[in-house]
UniProtKB/Swiss-Prot annotation:
The gene is fmt. PROSITE patterns: GART. It catalyses: L-methionyl-tRNA(fMet) + (6R)-10-formyltetrahydrofolate = N-formyl-L-methionyl-tRNA(fMet) + (6S)-5,6,7,8-tetrahydrofolate + H(+). (6S)-5,6,7,8-tetrahydrofolate binds at residues 113-116. Keywords: Protein biosynthesis, Transferase. This is Methionyl-tRNA formyltransferase. Its EC number is 2.1.2.9. InterPro entries: Fmt, Formyl_trans_C, Formyl_trans_C_sf, Formyl_transf_N, Formyl_transf_N_sf, Formyl_transferase-like_C_sf, GART_AS, Met-tRNA-FMT_C. The keyword Transmembrane does not apply. One of its GO terms (cellular component) is cytosol. GO terms for molecular function: methionyl-tRNA formyltransferase activity. Belongs to the Fmt family.
């Protein structure tokens, strides 16, 4: 049974904590938890523990927070736990080969895509950005490459037309733990089957940047709408009006609508939203956040700032 495995867990954010919680609930033998060092957060910039650390401490699990696993002291902490396997979920630190070789059965990773599609740092966001109709989680053996290890298990999740990165993150956080438990059971029983990735099918999920969140009105409306959902809740798509950034939390595509106006031109502003000409089609903005304000419906924004959204105005 998988509860006989001595497991090291390594992870940092809430997504990882949900997987650790599943291991704890299933009475797995977690012998140590690795997570990133406490970071300053909040208005007071106080040192704040990660969700994984908070959960581990509530269950009296040993916690280790090395700044790096490349140094001997961090590697020694792993070695002294005599683990059978190391489970890595959104840890945020690179595991050198010396660490990958320490557990008897190696290290496995929970990755938020259907590998080999979307290897890399932002698989959830890139799946939305590209218009994929499905994604999922892959449990893989870890090697020295970037998400290149052999695959042990996949769980598929449909992407809905209104999914954001936040909603898709939650969906994957729900299916990932069961996939992990199933994989551990197979490994413990000696029944796990590893499937090599087809490198010819690989795509890469580059890390997000604030710069690419700026809306380029020359793109098609459908692509812009996907960008808005992909960059929610971070870094949030935006445009500029009178040199002030306005964040876009939600938008829709006006099906069948076309415009001969220059991309970025406001075509209309009504209760349905602010209609913008794009490189192909019309985008309707429905939830905005002016600088220094909270996010609000377009109707509320127009009630106070309608003069800023006169048809014919061209947005930056």
């Amino acid at each position: 049974m998988s509860d006989s495995l001595r497991i090291i867990f390594a992870g940092t954010p809430d997504f990882a904590a949900r997987h650790l919680d599943a291991l704890i609930d299933a009475k797995q033998q977690v012998v140590g938890v690795f997570t990133q060092p406490d970071r300053p957060a909040g208005r007071g910039n106080r040192l704040t523990p990660s969700p994984v650390k908070e959960l581990a401490e509530r269950h009296d699990l040993p916690v280790f927070q090395p700044a790096s696993l490349r140094k001997p002291e961090g590697q020694r902490s792993v070695a002294e736990l005599n683990a059978d396997i190391m489970v890595v979920v959104a840890y945020g630190l690179i595991l050198p080969q010396a660490v990958l070789d320490l557990p008897l059965l190696g290290c496995i990773n929970v990755h938020g895509s259907l590998l080999p599609r979307w290897r890399g740092a932002a698989p959830i966001q890139r799946a939305l950005w590209a218009g994929d109709d499905r994604t999922g989680v892959t449990i893989m053996q870890m090697d020295a490459g970037l998400d290149t290890g052999a695959m042990l298990h996949k769980a598929v999740c449909a992407i809905q037309h209104d999914d954001t990165s936040a909603s898709l993150y939650d969906k994957l956080a729900q299916i990932g733990p069961n996939a992990l438990l199933s994989t551990l059971t197979q490994i413990a029983a000696g029944r796990a089957v590893a499937e090599s990735q087809d490198n010819a099918l690989a795509t890469y999920a580059d890390k997000l940047s604030k710069e690419e969140a700026r809306l380029d009105w020359r793109l098609p409306a459908a692509q812009l709408e996907r960008c808005i959902r992909a960059f929610n809740p971070w870094p949030i798509s935006y445009f500029s009006l009178a040199e002030q950034p306005i964040k876009v939390w939600a938008a829709g595509v006006d099906d069948g609508q076309t415009s001969s106006h220059a991309p970025g031109t406001i075509l209309a502003a009504d209760k349905a939203g602010i209609h913008i000409a794009t490189g192909a089609g019309v985008l309707t903005l429905t939830q905005l956040q002016p600088a220094g304000k909270k996010a609000m419906s377009v109707q509320d924004l127009l009630n106070s700032r309608r003069e800023s959204f006169i048809p014919g105005t061209v947005l930056d």
